[in-house]
Amino acid sequence: MIRGIKELKPKIFLFENVEGILSGKWDKKEGKKGEIFRDVWKGFSSIRGYTAQPTLLHAYGFGVPQNRPRVMIMGIRNDILKKSNLKPVKFDPSRENTTFSSQIKNNGGFFPKWDENEIDAPDLIDVLSDLDFTGWSSEKPFYKKKARTDFQKFLRENNITNEKGKEILTDHEFSNHKDHVVKRFKFMLDNNITKKSDLPVDMQTKKFNQKPVPAKWKIKPTITVTSLPDDYV
């Protein structure tokens, strides 16, 4: 990426990675925490003709219904920066890596800031409660329910209707699970099963990765689930 920036000289570049990069090390045994981000920062901040700044943003701060922190580095070409009112916030990579997060979280500068006291990110109920469970291995190409929340109404703005006047819904389909899998999923949801040992013997499998994820959390927003499609129910 750095080679590409030097060659193409874009007005702005943006690097993005997971929060774990702040404590990452090149070698698990002999490496030092934070060395990966120090090297990444050194590479981007030393590109001639650019001014760079890192930040740690949370998607929930901007109304996105999930807890998804991301480390970003933005670089602005100096001739473009001079024409703007933007001012970078300083970052000190020589300090302990344990300070990296506090140094750059919601730090403004090149990036937008959110108000920690006014976070109003929706949860899964707010976002998806207008969708029907139509049954395994099925698909409904239109909404059967009316939008209930402001977020759902926002998602349906300028929505297209079919010949019967119903709002078109795409990609709302369910996997074609076998009966014993459907039975296990239902048991897990009804009984909040999180461990293999809590399942009846006839439902236990050699590999058990499935975990029920609540649709509504005590503290918003909802966690981000990243997995193979069948790992969560």
Where are these regions (language model features)?
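A glycine-rich dinucleotide-binding beta-alpha-beta segment and adjacent secondary-structure elements
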Residues: K211-V233
